[in-house]
């Protein structure tokens, strides 16, 4: 199972315990139809396989850093996965201050920011590592909040259907990102391969227009009912 698939399972199970149909009903009253919200959440999922963007550029990165070992080059890709899991612990702390929709938008923006970094800083391999770390943190925010928002707005069979469509959109997004990165790399070099993350711009706009802002989630201290 891929890291994204594992995260989807984990966050879906976790959020199913935390939300009730009543919560979803209150949030649905903000004027957005279920179809519009579902569309926004599915579009949000397009970047969940964003690590596929770096696979096509690794060979060219290796040529750019001829003294670096193969394992050192591979870290550029694996760092995204390594960062994503521990970064999940940050999201619950943010929920008490920022709405889930805004956390998802921040996560999508972080992926874009991480991808733009090599356009200006790429002379050292650690700069690409930093880029991957930023992308990984952003990915974590998107994965967790996406599944959580689905649990907020949908229940039962409807929720199961949305989760099924989400898996399809993750796959479609991964394919688009990988193909786009490979094409940009072939046409303009490995640095430009990162520009496939510009897909984040319309995604942020779509999230803003289709997903209700929602409310922050107060943290519940241990030992208190």
Question: For each predicted feature, which ranges?
Answer:
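Extracytoplasmic
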Residues: 42-66
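Helix-loop-helix hairpin linking two adjacent transmembrane segments in secondary transporters
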Residues: 165-209
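Paired small-residue
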Residues: 126-134
């Amino acid at each position: 199972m891929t890291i994204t698939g594992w995260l989807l399972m984990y966050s879906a199970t976790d959020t199913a315990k935390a939300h009730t149909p009543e919560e979803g009903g209150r949030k649905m009253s903000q004027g957005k139809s279920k179809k519009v919200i579902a569309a926004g959440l599915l579009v949000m999922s397009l970047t969940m396989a964003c690590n596929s963007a770096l696979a096509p550029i690794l060979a060219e990165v290796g040529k750019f850093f001829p003294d670096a070992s193969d394992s050192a080059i591979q870290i550029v890709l694996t760092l995204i996965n390594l960062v994503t899991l521990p970064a999940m612990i940050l999201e619950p702390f943010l929920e008490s201050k920022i709405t889930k929709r805004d956390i998802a938008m921040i996560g999508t923006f972080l992926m874009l920011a991480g991808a733009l970094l090599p356009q200006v800083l790429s002379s050292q391999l650690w700069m690409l590592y930093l880029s991957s770390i930023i992308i990984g943190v952003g990915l974590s925010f998107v994965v967790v909040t996406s599944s959580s928002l689905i649990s907020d707005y949908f229940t039962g069979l409807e929720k199961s259907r949305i989760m099924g469509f989400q898996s399809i959109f993750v796959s479609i997004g991964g394919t688009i990102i990988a193909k786009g990165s490979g094409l940009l790399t072939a046409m303009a070099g490995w640095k430009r391969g990162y520009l496939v993350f510009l897909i984040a711009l319309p995604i942020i706009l779509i999230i803003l227009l289709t997903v209700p802002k929602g409310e922050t989630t107060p943290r519940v201290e241990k030992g208190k009912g």
